[in-house]
Each structure stands twice: as structure tokens, then as C-alpha cells.
Regions:
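Beta-strand-centric surfaces of beta-sandwich/beta-rich domains
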Residues: 1-212
């Protein structure tokens, strides 16, 4: 559960971490924020590139609900969620799910998504491996109340499917960031317009990198 005391501790830890890396935080704006990266699911892909920076075009144009990191900023990641969504790249009302909901992911697509949950995230920054293997399974969350014809999933988006990151990960907008989700094989089937969303929450430090 999020608390004011916990949020203050996260803020102070992030400030100390950024300062220890040689960046000035005395005149920088430090605020709570988030990053959101999306990539379309595919039956032919087992290695998904997770875009973080605003100028990352490896997967093509950015999707409408993404929130990327500006090159001038640093983001300290303190929580991560990996969820599944359904919607086109331009759908502003695309819904997110914390597990392969059988009401939405019909036929075999719900079972086939286990190849994603049996995979892992890995992160390399400036050719240095920062996160070798972060299991996606820790984000799998099935609520007590599940969706049916007359109900919707119970889901607290402030906590469910989010997992704390310690020590905090420094996402530097001026760095070469290679973020990947490695699935345990490509899904045999996928629902049309379904995608993976990686949401990072933490502290944003504005205008502190070498990029002006």
C-alpha cells in the first residue's frame, strides 16, 4: 500500500542516488512520475524490444498511450509492472489486464500468453548489464473477483501487478538503453491488437543530463 512516508523515503533515496552519480539535484525538478512502454504481441517474436527513450523507433512509431523518457531527463525506477493490453496503437481507451483474462483472451490465446509470463526482462545501459534477469511471473496477478459477463476484474492499479525495485534503476535519457523482454518462446496464438505494456514508476529528474 502506498503511503506518504514510503513516498518520501523513495524521493530521498532517488535524490541521493542521482547526486552520487555526479548530477546536480540542487536546482533540478524532482517529481513523482512514470514511464510506459508498449510493444505489440506477435506469434513470430520471442525477444521484445521495450522502448524507453522518446527517439527510439526500433519498433516503429510510438503508441498513443506510451510515456517515454526525454533525452534531457533521468528517471529513477522504483516499481515495475508488466501487463497485457488490448487496443490498437492509436486507441486511447485501450484496457490493461494483470493476467491472461479468459473472458477477453478467448480460445487458446490465454494459455499461450504463459510464454510471456515464463520469460524475463533484461536491461543493458551503455553496454553494461544492469538487470540480467527479472522474472515476469512476479507481475502475474489474478484477482479474487474475476471478469465474467456481469462483473469486471477487481484491480487496484496503485499496487496490483507492481513490484518494487531495489536498488533503484537509473534510466538516463542521454544513455544507450536496451530494454528487452525475453519470452519462453513466441506465443503460438495472440489476440488481435494485443500488446505488452511495461510501466515504470519512480522519480523524474528534469534537465540534468548532458543533452540540452
Amino acid at each position: 500500500m502506498a503511503t506518504q512516508m514510503g513516498s518520501r523515503m523513495v524521493f530521498e533515496n532517488a535524490k541521493t542516488l542521482v547526486r552520487s552519480l555526479g548530477y546536480s539535484v540542487e536546482h533540478a525538478k524532482l517529481t513523482q512520475s512514470y514511464l510506459r512502454s508498449e510493444v505489440a504481441l506477435s506469434t513470430s517474436i520471442a525477444n521484445y524490444h521495450i522502448p524507453v527513450l522518446v527517439n527510439d523507433t526500433q519498433n516503429g512509431a510510438s503508441r498513443v498511450n506510451e510515456k517515454r523518457l526525454n533525452l534531457q531527463d533521468i528517471f529513477i525506477t522504483t516499481e515495475i509492472a508488466v501487463v497485457i493490453g488490448v487496443g490498437t496503437a492509436t486507441a486511447t481507451a485501450a484496457k490493461l489486464y494483470t493476467y491472461p483474462n479468459a473472458t477477453v483472451f478467448t480460445s487458446a490465446t490465454d494459455d499461450d500468453l504463459w510464454s510471456i509470463y515464463n520469460g524475463y526482462l533484461n536491461l543493458t545501459i551503455n553496454n553494461e548489464q544492469v538487470l540480467p534477469a527479472w522474472d515476469v511471473l512476479r507481475h502475474y496477478f489474478v484477482p479474487q473477483t474475476q471478469q465474467s459477463a456481469s462483473t469486471t476484474d477487481q484491480w487496484s492499479a496503485s499496487s496490483d501487478a507492481f513490484y518494487p525495485v531495489e536498488p533503484g534503476i537509473v534510466m538516463n535519457g542521454a544513455a544507450n538503453i536496451n530494454f528487452q523482454l525475453t519470452a519462453n518462446g513466441a506465443p503460438a496464438t495472440v489476440l488481435a491488437n494485443s500488446f505488452i505494456a511495461v510501466v515504470q514508476r519512480g522519480i523524474l529528474c528534469q534537465n540534468v543530463t548532458t543533452v540540452k
